[in-house]
């Protein structure tokens, strides 16, 4: 909820702010030590650098964050945005020559690694659900509820006013056509 509301920020996290942001995550029940290594937040998705002793990784920080943001905008399934994911960078092998650590090499490698990890973790595509309200004569209420249930809908309330029944519920968008 704190991520959704933007209480923890959004975008790259400066190194000097990482400890404070990590402490905020700790207050929310997450591993404070891990979250102090935070690189970036993109909506409800977080990138953490959990590596140790990798030389020159700091030189590619911005490129890693850029690749992370690309994946957050277009995830591995149907190019849909990611939501509620913690991405941990646990290892990296960087070329010793700086010329081979540029955007053309780093961004696709990181992007593909994150997408591959997400696919291996059995990512799911959330189904869009719509709220519905149907006002109809009371004698039609049975048919309306039957249709709603056969279309995988959920009835939340059915207030009756005079001879009109109002059916309020939710149902998958794909089932409404």
Task: Locate predicted features.
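Accessory interaction regions appended to the cores of large information-processing enzymes
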Residues: 1-177
